[in-house]
Amino acid sequence: MTFAASFRALLCVLFCAALVHCKTRTKRYVPHSELWRILAVVDELQREQAAEQRQEDALALALRSDIAGGGGGGQLADNVRWFPETYDYGALADRDVDKRVFDSLGGYEVHGFKKRGSLDAIPQDTDASSDKRALDSLGGFQVHGWKRALDTLGGFQVHGWKRGSGAEKRQVDRLGGFQVHGWKKRALDSLGGFQVHGWKKRGTGGQMHASSPRVVPWGSRSLLADTQSGHRWKRDTELVENRQTTGQQTEVNKRALDSLGGFQVHGWKRSGEAGKRQVDSLGGFQVHGWKRADDQGKRALDSLGGFQVHGWKRFDNSAGEKRALDSLGGFQVHGWKRAGDKKSLDSLGSFQVHGWKRFDNDISGQKRSLDSLGSFQVHGWKRSDQDNKRALDSLGGFQVHGWKRADDDGKRSLDSLGSFQVHGWKRADEDDKKSLDSLGSFQVHGWKRGDEDDKRSLDSLGSFQVHGWKRADEDDKRSLDSLGSFQVHGWKRSDEDDKRSLDSLGSFQVHGWKRSDEDDKRSLDSLGSFQVHGWKRADEDDKRSLDSLGSFQVHGWKRNSPGLKRALDSLGGFQVHGWKRNNEYYSGAENEKRALDSLGGFQVHGWKRDQPGEKRSLDSLGSFQVHGWKRNLNNLGSFQVHGWKKNSADEMGDKPGVESYQDNSGKILSGKAQEFEGGDETGDIHGVVRTLSGVDASGKERENIKELDAKFKTNDGGVGVEHIFVDNVKSADDDVPSAGQM
């Protein structure tokens, strides 16, 4: 332990002992002499911390200058702490008391804290930001890692970091919403559950000789510099393990993805002769990437949209026959490919639809078997030559339909279908009608036809389409469905019908609307799950109201002309936020309240402001909250990011920690406040120590003035209050009693 650390520890012990001694020896008040000793300890500790920080900054600046000039930076780097140990942000531990200190975060924290050094004030130092402290290690559902200057991150980005400018850049691809990964130069932290990806390392080539590159020591990893380039700090500088810098074949050219869990995005594989490892740029919720064949016949993935599963196409070089996968939309079902005499489907992960495979060389069985399917599977079937039955596997959620039939059974029956079923039908020999089972949610429709019925019905069923149309010879009406992905219904029109109803349906659209010539109202259909929102308005009704929204809804709003109020409906899961504003704001009143609705899961944050008290308070936030702040921060739950709080006595300063005070003689001074607690295990002595400076009433410059407000419990159970204003603080060596005296 260094002398400075030992001295700091001794001061802290003496300080706490002084507080306990003050508390136990007095009946009602703490003597001024004891509190003056506290002020002396505070002043001495701050001076010691400032001296230590200046020494560390000087070493760091010297090291960077040495590296830039080409001098023995490799040896000097071993003796410098690039990222100093974290300060104990407890009582009297932070010399920069005007800085914001993040609260200690619980499980699933996003990051910790960072602190700037005094080098930021050096004009000629262009890399001042590189002396920042790294963020703490991140756990599951982490947002990002660390870098010396953190990028501005967008929605749900994972991480990224870069360092320096010019030739010293280390940059990660700009990440968008729900993007998967990207990094270079430094390894990513090990991520927990629901991880997006892992980490990989890059090398400079197949062989790495000790004579060509130079390894600059840097912690547990090393910086591999190219001594032949004339500029060691290049953009392509790589981090490698010290033990891998021999003349043998290195392993740093391997890239490995961590084993991914549920809702994983993709994986990759590598071919021997190409040596390429690449993952396609993936969009929102895409499933996997690509693969490459050895015979130059490349298999590429189609550009996939949201929630698409996969797709591919292949060229047969001999026959020129192309096999392409249909263009898949949202929640598309499957795709297939064929190579040679085999028909195989890729093994799909979660959100898989289905698949099947068949082997030509399997003559005896000629079986078609379905892969074991997971959630979001659609259906499947299998059949063998010796088995004249066709059976459907027991299907789970998101099943479409299925049927089975045996030779000795003249009936076709449909399995009981669950949610997201499309339709089904059954028919018996003695029954000339075809009837449709009662269908559940997201069911499409069915049809039936009898011998005496000259009408024809046709289902043009697509992926997850909802219904079709039918037309009879004597019926001059035509009904057509323009069906899209997850569309619910369409429209129809007849010659004698002057009403027209049209649905402009989009992806994940749930409903539409209709309007007739004589009807001046526009109404919205009742919306179900996966609905987005809707609205309706009547000519005589000046209000616009929003329907009650269900799951996966985004938001809605309504507006009242008389009050000019905007209110947000109570939102459910995956809601973003909402706000409302009082109509007095438009009339010039000073109410101007802004309140945030109570938010549920996946909420971002919220705040409200009350004009009379000028207070800003944060709503109680639930899981997946990002952050919030106020002068007294609420207790935050899991997945919170950070927060900070400031003494409630701060009513005058412009920024946290800087305050203005008036002493007993009328002098106005400004300074910095630092809270403390002491005493026994009950912690019943607490208060604020302020270091003040400024110009007094006579115009004289004043510095290092200490003011102390202390509250404590007396021996008889009462509360004692003490206020001391000290103009000149003596040395701690003169005032602090020894351990024997106490």
From Swiss-Prot:
One of its GO terms (cellular component) is extracellular region. Keywords: Hormone, Neuropeptide, Secreted, Signal. Expressed in pleural, pedal, abdominal, buccal and cerebral ganglia. Residues 1-22 form the signal peptide. It comes from the Eukaryota. The keyword Secreted applies. Residues 23-98, 117-131, 164-168, 202-220, 236-253, 271-275, 293-297, 315-321, 339-341, 359-366, 384-388, 406-410, 428-432, 450-454, 472-476, 494-498, 516-520, 538-542, 560-564, 582-592, 610-614, 647-742 form a propeptide. It is found in: Secreted. GO terms for biological process: neuropeptide signaling pathway. GO terms for molecular function: hormone activity. Initiates organized rhythmic motor output of feeding circuit. This is Feeding circuit activating peptides. It comes from Aplysia californica.
